[in-house]
Amino acid sequence: MYQKILIRYGELTLKGQNKRDFINDLKRNLMFHIPKEQIKMEYDRAFLDFSLTNLDALKYVFGISSYSCVYEVESSLAAITSKVLDIAKQKYPFKTFAIAARRHNKNFEMNSNDLNRHLGCAILSNFEVKVNLEEPDLKIYVEVRDASTYIFIDYIAGLGGMPLNSAGQVLHLMSGGIDSPVAAYLLQKRGLRINFLNFITPPHTDEKTTQKVDELIKVIAKYQGSAKLYQVNFTDIMNYIGLVSNQKYKIILMRRSFYRIAQMLAKKLHIKALSNGENLAQVASQTLEAIHTVSAPITLPIFRPLLSFDKNETIKIAEKIGTMPISILKACETCELFAPKNPIIKPTPEEASELEKELDKLPELEKLAVENVTIKTISTL
């Protein structure tokens, strides 16, 4: 029976003076899922008490390069040799093997090379097998540390990236499509905690549509324990923008309004960046000119992690993280309801600003939308 789960840190091993802060962020992330007393953080490794529950939890923790289920023995040559032979006995028959021993404890009686030879000879003396350092049937890893030695036979890939919260927070414009949940996941991987903003247009968007967004956020929230969803009633603004003289600009003006509202809300919440699931030139509103025009009134950075992705790349991630089955459910999206037959492909900020002069009540309506935002906490714990 395994005693521990050994965790290897991801990029945070490169972070110099800030490394302790990143390790503390990782510990807090682990504590979303695992009791504090079962976690031990060290400078280059973390250790968890072994359980299937703890093992499963690591699927939702960023900042981990890899992890292994390990046997823990005292750091003595006799104890290490005994456990290595025990593992070999459990795995036999096998034709070839290799030993990969590392001595972190410099006071240990053998160096790494001598320990490799000693353990290899012990197996050769007890089993009819051969050494194969390139592609062995069985490879046994040994890490000799100060208090204990950890022995294991495989590496499990972690999510990589940076620990959640290590990069701050972002306000993410969330829809029920395929792209925006995947974009949120990728931002989490870079250490950002996600706050979600969703625009609804009752009675056009029904309960089924809002439930779909809630379910998508539940999937993404697994990686951060819980998430705040800010919901804005956009019906009055949508109808008002619909009065503009150049109907081809409706989607552009709507998206500019989205971002002005998002920026006002973000500043109110002391959040320093916005984000979305936009992809360059995927649809009419995502040409370079459209993105430039929509972003023109905004001073906060707007993160677009999917900007250069092929749709198939995005779908692959959506399937992997479990959002795809929810995203493809039929629902009424605000953008779809409002789209003109022939949207403009190459808008300009100047033309958009001129058209907004026709809508003199727009700033007041946007301010009102922020004041009346509804807040929902979505938790998966």
Swiss-Prot record:
Locate the coiled-coil region(s) and give their ranges. none
Q: Where in the cell is it found?
A: Cytoplasm
- Protein name (database record): Probable tRNA sulfurtransferase
The record's listing under Pfam families reads: ThiI, ThiI_fer, THUMP
What pathway or pathways are given for this protein in its record? Cofactor biosynthesis; thiamine diphosphate biosynthesis
The record's listing under CDD domains reads: PPase_ThiI, THUMP_ThiI
Any single biological process term in GO: thiazole biosynthetic process
**Described function:** Catalyzes the ATP-dependent transfer of a sulfur to tRNA to produce 4-thiouridine in position 8 of tRNAs, which functions as a near-UV photosensor. Also catalyzes the transfer of sulfur to the sulfur carrier protein ThiS, forming ThiS-thiocarboxylate. This is a step in the synthesis of thiazole, in the thiamine biosynthesis pathway. The sulfur is donated as persulfide by IscS.
Task: Provide this UniProt record's keywords sorted from A to Z.
Answer: ATP-binding, Cytoplasm, Nucleotide-binding, RNA-binding, Thiamine biosynthesis, Transferase, tRNA-binding
GO MF: ATP binding; CCA tRNA nucleotidyltransferase activity; tRNA binding; tRNA-uracil-4 sulfurtransferase activity
Entry similarity comment:
Belongs to the ThiI family.
The record's Gene Ontology cellular component field reads:
cytosol
Q: What is its main location?
A: cytoplasm
InterPro entries linked: Rossmann-like_a/b/a_fold, ThiI_AANH, ThiI_fer, ThiI_N, THUMP_dom, THUMP_ThiI, tRNA_STrfase, tRNA_sulfurtransferase_ThiI
- What does it catalyze? [ThiI sulfur-carrier protein]-S-sulfanyl-L-cysteine + a uridine in tRNA + 2 reduced [2Fe-2S]-[ferredoxin] + ATP + H(+) = [ThiI sulfur-carrier protein]-L-cysteine + a 4-thiouridine in tRNA + 2 oxidized [2Fe-2S]-[ferredoxin] + AMP + diphosphate; [ThiS sulfur-carrier protein]-C-terminal Gly-Gly-AMP + S-sulfanyl-L-cysteinyl-[cysteine desulfurase] + AH2 = [ThiS sulfur-carrier protein]-C-terminal-Gly-aminoethanethioate + L-cysteinyl-[cysteine desulfurase] + A + AMP + 2 H(+)
**EC number(s) per entry:** 2.8.1.4
